[in-house]
């Protein structure tokens, strides 16, 4: 029929991570030869959806966005593929309190941390080897003795996000202060010795 194919300009591949989950972006595609209308389709809606050229990230993996230039009187229908690659995202752990000062006689207490969206890992706590505190996975701290210990909050790795570890939570434990000894708290009297102004000088 003598018709030519059209030419579509578009990126070969677009890389994103799961931190972009739910976010949309536009593919920079245009017809450089031809006069058809562009339409867009995804090959896997579990990874990315597309509407009017706007792509929304759904899940991890790889799919294609198929861009078609419709047939016209002068040109054939033409197709171009853009690969969308979605990698695992990184997680961010929020730790409201990062240092504690305790005494040996204090009761157990609980550490706090959470994973910021869109991260979906579970938070667990781990401590460096020490004889100051014992820490359970869910963050309950039992005091063992005086000293300093470092504890870390860990966001577990998932299908969509990599494992992540927080900065150190520092726990300092001191021996309990003893009650002030009343006897030792008596203020010392200041003794003032004055000499008469007419004292004989040798």
Regions found by a protein language model. Give the residues of each.
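Solvent-exposed beta-strand/loop surfaces, strongest in extracytoplasmic domains of secreted
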Residues: 1-202
